[in-house]
Amino acid sequence: ADGVRLAHASTVAKKVVMETPEEYLRKNGSYCIYARKAPCAVDTAAVRRTVEALVRQQVPFDFNFDHSSAKALYCTEFVVHVLEQNNCFCFSRLRKRNYMYPNDVLKIISTR
């Protein structure tokens, strides 16, 4: 996977990081990787800039799993936040729940 980088909210690093798939798999005891087409039109360059900014800002992992604020992000919240920052609000309805699970995102994608 030359040049491929995964961006995610890492419980190991305790912040948003970007790393190779090999680094991700080596550092994480449990993992799931979803490669799906965005369910709405997005500017991939803008999404990348948003992700790179979160990495630069060293946004911490949200161990409280509180998606009412973007001061810290957990895995699924990271995906929803990045897309919302780029005018893709298809997952925003998940914010009405106490917790947003990866499966919730997959269900929305599969119905589109």
Task: List PLM regions with ranges.
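Short linear motifs in intrinsically disordered/low-complexity regions
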Residues: 3, 44, 104-105
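The feature captures the short pre-catalytic strand/loop hairpin that immediately precedes
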Residues: 52-60
